[in-house]
Amino acid sequence: MIKRVHLGQGRADEILDLPNLIEIQLNSYEKFLQLDKLKNKKPLLNEGLESVFRNIFPIKSGNGDVALEYERYYIENDTLNFTEKECKRKGQSYEAVLKVRLNLQFLTTGEIRQKDVYMGTIPLMTERGTFIINGAERVIVSQIHRSPGVVFYKEKDLYSARIIPYRGSWLEFEIDSKKDYLYVKIDRKKRILITLFLRALGFDTREKIIETFYNIKKIKVEEGTKRDLPGQYLAKSINIRENMYYRAGDKITLQDVEDFLQNGVNEIELVDFDGYNDVSGKYFVSSNVILNCLEKEDAFFALKDGSKELPKESVMLAVYGALFPGEPISIDNAENDLKTIFFSERRYDLGRVGRYKLSKKFGSDDLSTSVLTMDDIVNTISHLLRIYEGHDILDDIDHLGNRRVRSVGELLTNIYKGAMSRVEKIAKDRMSNKEVFNLKPQELISVKPIVSAVKEFFATSQLSQFMDQVNPLAELTHKRRLNALGPGGLSRDRAGFEVRDVHYTHYGRMCPIETPEGPNIGLIVSLATYSRVNDYGFLETPYRKVVNGEVTNELEYLSAIDEEKKCIAQANAAFNSDGKYLEDLVSVRISGDYTTTNPKNIDYMDVSPRQLISVSSALIPFLEHNDANRALMGSNMQRQAVPLLFPKPPIVGTGMESVVAKDSGVVVKAKRSGEVILATSNKIVVKPFESENVKDLDEYHIVKYERTNQDTCFNQSVLVKEGQKVERGEIIADGPATRYGELALGNNLLLGVIPWNGFNYEDAILISDRIVKEDLYTSIHIKEFSIEVRETKLGPEKVTGDIPNVSEKILNKLDENGIIRIGTYVKPGDILVGKVTPKSEGDITPEFRLLTSIFGEKAKDVKNNSLKVPHGTEGTVIDVQRITKEDVGNLSPGVEEILKVYVAKKRKLKEGDKMAGRHGNKGVVAKILPVEDMPYLADGTPLDICLNPLGVPSRMNIGQLMESQLGLAGKYLSESYNVPVFESATNEQIQEKLKKAGFNPTSKEILYDGYTGEPFENEVMVGVIYMLKLHHLVDDKMHARSTGPYSLVSQQPLGGKAQFGGQRLGEMEVWALEAYGAAHTLQELLTVKSDDMSGRVKIYENIVKGVPTNVSGIPESFNVLMQELRGLGLDLSIYDDNGNQVPLTEKEEELINKS
């Protein structure tokens, strides 16, 4: 391991170690499958797969005679056909068989038939948090979506409340502030007046509705109060006699008061608008919205004042008609239907989270009811009205209390839920159809829906992604990603600015820096370093508790909901050894506000300064001195760094390098403490101390030169020697882009910040030849080429070295089976696997047919269908795989075997390759200069790299300068530094180190010109900077074409490297040539070099024969235009100067010749 010096303003030790960085994946999947708990036969009943089976079973037949009951499920580990390594080599999925023990119970006879039923296979997660599907490693990205529960928000003049369930119908309330009416919508259908909805749910009288929402006051009716009563609303109906009936909710007039007095009504109950807060625990409202709705009912049903209440039929007709327009209605059914929509567990499920959110919002303790209750509906309406009146505040939809994370386990649970409900339906059908008493449990269960749903999810879901495997950091970040897109999430086009923006609740939960540039900005984010997902799916972050102004070592994880209104101090607030703050005013944050306060008011304190950013951002030293946009680019570009052959860890690190290497899964860690008894290049054997058994050894297999998903090279190298003692968890072998157990994405280079003859203009980079010679930026890239050998209708294809019409020189590289030999250097066009296919009858000439009929089969010809090296690829063949049906058991139909050839290429750094630092300072190598021509220091040391000083001021990434200064000191003092993010080294500390190393405190030195030996006019800033080579290599982009494929309709060359296309000559280029009057150049570009078919062939012949050429025909695009005009019904023909018709197609030519 490297010894690092801690250099910064904070303490070297952290109060809380970083968690396992991929635990979000591992924990979620373990919760789903519960493998550890299955061993003890005690799975949690309401988690994952167990909960799915418990909810679906028992399945009962329609008549109730037969029931299919569930006992338990188990995973058959011995059914793993292949290990992880074999799955990758053979293109298989790493999965195990899922079996469920079912009891088929005949309730009439009491007989029980038990059987373990096959339920398909289930992909298993590797210990690195990935899945292997069809031979490729994939990651299931966590999705961040709107949490179930209730949300209150305002759009234009509408105040709305939405109750969003986990599964079921959405319920939406809205107040139209212009008209003061409250409506309800179910599943975004037609809106219904709230009072009608309440009546349909059982609040069938006006009195019930009023006493639910309003405080009621009793008032004596006497001469003294007579003047105050008119204009107030009755809360209880008053029935004096037949034609004197006063309804609750009606406004009192002066005449009414007189009637009361005359008829001996001494006391009446009125709506008390002002007393909305008088009763504790009750949330009454103070506006007359509900009363307006009652009034509107009268208008809606044209009631006469005399009639007392709305008949139930009218209410049901109105509500049901809006919900299910055009369906026939029976009142009892309508009532049942309405109840089942919200109150039946089969149709509606708030989920644990939805219930938790509702209880939290309305202050109830109920955490178990999964359906809506009448209280929920009443509370929601009251709360919405109180917001409308200004007594409560709206919700913030982008608050992390209203967004939650669904990880692998939950996504898979939902897939299984959907599949199992189809299985249930099929089972019920089979129970009713067949002779039930002859049935076995396995005959009732159809596995198809499960198998296809799981396959579809892993293979095609938007959240199941091909793992980004460029380097260990890319792998790790991919597993910690949160995606707002995908099924049930947002879509790119509809996501507005607010959803994408940074929110104050992201602090310590989601990284404000790391997100892609482009259309997905803010929709795909990264988990912060200490963040974790709680049982409800909300993101939590740890804090230290502060009690009475004293910091304790007690930790508490808070979700965004818990953190609201809490007073939180920063991690670097100064306090003494007793935990007392040193200053009287400490800077804190409360919700979204930043302020200072007395230590007594503080509730919590941050755990670490790097708590609020992600792993990638935490790898950037001096991050706080960079502009946020550049920090974003720096975080994203570290993920694109190619693993090098000889990387070095950075001199200036942040302390995160070893954590990333350890958790990424690319290094080998010792499982138990022990002594190394064998260490070869591909195997380590450790004898554990704890075990007495001589045969109990830990074996570790070292991966050598394997291809990753992105064609980079995965190679591990051993770090231990035989006889060495190792501790548990110690790193015993490095992986790609790691050195001595630390992440090493690039190399440290001696830098001069100086323009050099215009070669580093506009972010270009000038580099010394030493870097290429010493292979500092050489990387290995491995490509896979595969070919299938099929059974065709004319006979099988054959792999053979006997290929027609191929030169001996090319065939020499193949072995006796017609496969390229391992170790051969191949170039474009070389054959990797010789394969011949039987020719179809149509390909055969008449002469050949005659021979076949005379000599039988012998003369049948074959066609060369070999696998060749594509353009732009060369390298050494390092491996050949042959996969046959015997190996795998099932290849796709018609395929006899698959051959894969792996070609590796060493790529040195060259002009056109993209390089970058860790601060978003990216550029393209413009020139590689001989060492002797590079500027050099006073002691003769030539620079490795020259960057343009103009790249710094406008970009505001000063971190690169501070890193270079400290790096220079570190190089000459032979030290490596840990400079933690947000508490990095001060200028004084850096200058101290520079002086110690014998440099100017400004790190500006006199440089000499390599050409002349003269010193440059001004001193130049010199430093040591950490540079990476990115996965944008010039070899992958460079492309040339002479002749190649043409588009079918327009007959113009295709575009793009993948199609081996040509260079586009667009209208602007044509204008430029026209402006120069280059008529002949233009003519040949637009005809023979593009789409004049006959001209192309002729000119090629003439060039081959060496004849001067001047060919011009009709370009195909003209023919296309002609045919399009004919398609419009215009009869067009072309004639030459002599009046002869020019044929456009072969058919026309025949017609003209005939006539």
UniProtKB/Swiss-Prot annotation:
GO BP: any one term: DNA-templated transcription
Reaction equations catalysed: RNA(n) + a ribonucleoside 5'-triphosphate = RNA(n+1) + diphosphate
Any Gene Ontology CC annotation: DNA-directed RNA polymerase complex
SUPFAM superfamilies named in the record: beta and beta-prime subunits of DNA dependent RNA-polymerase
Annotated EC: 2.7.7.6
UniProt keyword list: DNA-directed RNA polymerase, Nucleotidyltransferase, Transcription, Transferase
Pfam family of the protein (one): RNA_pol_Rpb2_6
Stated role: DNA-dependent RNA polymerase catalyzes the transcription of DNA into RNA using the four ribonucleoside triphosphates as substrates.
Assembly and binders: The RNAP catalytic core consists of 2 alpha, 1 beta, 1 beta' and 1 omega subunit. When a sigma factor is associated with the core the holoenzyme is formed, which can initiate transcription.
Family (UniProt): Belongs to the RNA polymerase beta chain family.
Protein name: DNA-directed RNA polymerase subunit beta
Native source organism of the sequence: Borreliella afzelii (strain PKo)
Lineage: Bacteria, Pseudomonadati, Spirochaetota, Spirochaetia, Spirochaetales
